[in-house]
Amino acid sequence: MVAPSGAMSDSENSSSSSSDAEELARCREAATPAWGLEQRPGAAERPEAGAADKQAPTPQPSRRHEVNQHEEDGNDLRTTPEFRAHVAKKLGALLDSSIAIAEVWKKSQKAKMQQVAKEEDGFRLFFTSIPGGHKKEASPRPCRKRQPPSSSEDSDEELQRCREAAVSASDILQESAIHCPAKAEEKKKLKKKAKKKVDNADLAAAPGLEQVKEAGVVNGDPVSLGIQKKRKKKAKKSREAPLCPPAECAAAKPEN
């Protein structure tokens, strides 16, 4: 539906024109000090000595389109009052919802600001120190006291430790090079083995000596005979040495 457009009365036209004129005058008064278009009212009331003949400049007409002077009325959309009421109700509901959301956001922001203010109480000793860190530190766990061991267990452990740490004199003598009978016996055994090897070699060479002797007798060479005698003496000594141990030989010498 379209609302009927009626002509405004003369009294309304006059009141609107007077209010518009007052607004224009106020705007001009506010704009003249900045732009220098007109003089201030105080300056116009107090003219200088040489400016009596000068007149104030005439105000320029406004170029704005005045609503009251055009052909149509103020309702350009030509809406009905019912439609305007419906739109107003919708806008009111929208504004109420936005205001409620804004209040909730403000409450959350206030709570955050209060929390930050509580955390920032005091001062930071270092740049990396966390505010409120001393509150979050967990209390240390209580140390459990060990029960004192019984006397029998303690004595057994001490004896075992002493046995592990103790070293006998025989172990020290065995490891030392001076008092080591086992090593001396090993050396004697090695010497005996070396002598036996030499004796065996001499016995193996005995048939060869006999052949050389026979050859020397046949040839009648005195040098070969002397060599043969020396070899025989060495062979006899090597045979007598293993048969007679050194202790028995020493005991037999004074008897001879």
From Swiss-Prot:
The modification Phosphothreonine is found at T80. Residues 228-237 have a biased composition (Basic residues). Residues 1-19, 246-256 have a biased composition (Low complexity). InterPro entries: CUSTOS. A motif (Nucleolar localization signal (NLS)) lies at residues 228-235. One of its GO terms (cellular component) is nuclear envelope. Keywords: Developmental protein, Nucleus, Phosphoprotein, Wnt signaling pathway. GO terms for biological process: Wnt signaling pathway. It comes from the Eukaryota. Its main location: nucleus. Residues 63-83 have a biased composition (Basic and acidic residues). Residues 1-83, 127-163, 227-256 are annotated as: Disordered. The modification Phosphoserine is found at S62, S139. It is found in: Nucleus envelope. PANTHER family: CHROMOSOME 12 ORF 43 HOMOLOG, PROTEIN CUSTOS. Plays a role in the regulation of Wnt signaling pathway during early development. Belongs to the CUSTOS family. This is Protein CUSTOS. It comes from Mus musculus.
